Amino acid sequence: MIASFYAFLDYLKNMKAASPHTLRNYSIDLSSLKCFLEKKGELTPTPPLSLQEDSRSSSQLSFSLFTKENIRLYLLEQIQTTHSKRTVRRRLSAIKSFAKFCVKNQWIPENPAEMIRGPRLPKELPSPLTYEQVLALMSAPDLDKVTGFRDRCLLELFYSSGLRISEITALNRSDIDFQSNLLRICGKGKKERIVPMTKVAVQWLQAYLDHPDRAAVEQDHQACFLNRFGKRLSTRSIDRKFQQYLLKTGLSGTITPHTIRHTIATHWLERGMDLKTIQLLLGHTSLETTTIYTHVSMKLKKQIHDEAHPHNLED
């Protein structure tokens, strides 16, 4: 069975063009399942699944343990060990995709996870930042350092073009058209789209790329954004710096780089941009995904209405 895990990860990488972030999540989720099944079958534990071909281990794990009952027990254990409902749902989704792949390859007769439902999540709308909060966040990086210059540029691009964090890290210098103020973005499934940049974002991007301290450490000559060692910046590094800036500005709540993507989409809608254009800019495959911002916009309008209405101001 261990070989099927690796075949699935290779399939995601080579055939589905999954991002490194997605591959890492699948590897973590399936490693967790593997560990549970090994324990259930009283087998010798093996290392987590590796994305590196030269460090992959073998196991005596059999498909006979990959049953509906064991999957249910695994999910129950996940819930009881304080994993969030969102994480458990993600892991179930990974298991279903893996099982479907195994059925397609005729390794198992049917998908044991097909009819299993994950824990329900409360319906949550993304909470966008205000324009003032966006400005506060952008002012947080220390511009005396090239890394601060880089981070200001990152924040400008997040808000300018509504990019995903994986799209930012994958950005190459050759993807930038300074004459037209456009970016060529490689999105999910390696689907390309062209997005515009604001003049402010262009100025910060040009200034960062021309920064002498950036040139002094540059090792990856293709990557747009570099870490302090001159190599391509990772999504983890961006997440870590982002959390530091949230603390510095005093912003609270569940705020991530993806929040800025939600924020600019909401701001575009509130300023009259049509949903189809927002869909194209964000790289959504389905317009249905984009319509969530109409609910966010209405929620904000209702909040403003309730706070400003004279009847609500009475004692």
Curated annotation (Swiss-Prot):
- A GO CC annotation given for this chain: cytoplasm
| Taxonomy, superkingdom | Bacteria
Where in or outside the cell it occurs: the entry states:
Cytoplasm
Residue stretches making up the Core-binding (CB) domain: 1-103
Among the GO molecular function terms of this UniProt record, one is: DNA binding
* Principal subcellular localization: cytoplasm
Please state every residue range assigned to the domain named Tyr recombinase.
124-306
Enzyme active site: R164, K188, H258, R261, H284, Y293
The record's comment on protein family reads: Belongs to the 'phage' integrase family. XerC subfamily.
Cross-referenced HAMAP family: Recomb_XerC_XerD
* Biological role stated in the UniProt entry: Site-specific tyrosine recombinase, which acts by catalyzing the cutting and rejoining of the recombining DNA molecules. The XerC-XerD complex is essential to convert dimers of the bacterial chromosome into monomers to permit their segregation at cell division. It also contributes to the segregational stability of plasmids.
Write the protein's name.
Tyrosine recombinase XerC
